Amino acid sequence: MHVILKPGKKQDLTPLAFNEKRMNSNETLQLLREHKAELIKRYDVNHLSLFGSTARNQARANSDIDILVSFNGAATSSRYFGLQFYLEDLLGHPIDLVTEKALRIELRPYIEQEAIRV
């Protein structure tokens, strides 16, 4: 979650609460699919996949949402964090964004088995 600071003002840096509604895979996938064209345009996303507790419909209200991403080209900090913040704002939950290149080899088979392509 990101915080916007106003110059010259002392501010409480406690982050705003994320949405406390539990997301299921259908709701999450629908929102991601509705915004897919924008994600491609803004961040040069090649593809996204949902995995983890949300994909298995086992997420709690305070769960993060796990998303596997592949970019066309390099996963620059601007692309990576821009996408992460966009998705957090869109979905109202913390996002654990994992690039395919950064995916640990021992976890790859499990994630690929449960991943749902957007």
Predicted regions and their residues:
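Conserved histidines in hydrophobic membrane contexts and catalytic metal-binding motifs
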Residues: 50
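Short hydrophobic/aromatic beta-strand micro-patches
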Residues: 68-70
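Catalytic core of pol beta-like nucleotidyltransferases
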Residues: 1-47, 55-61, 72-118
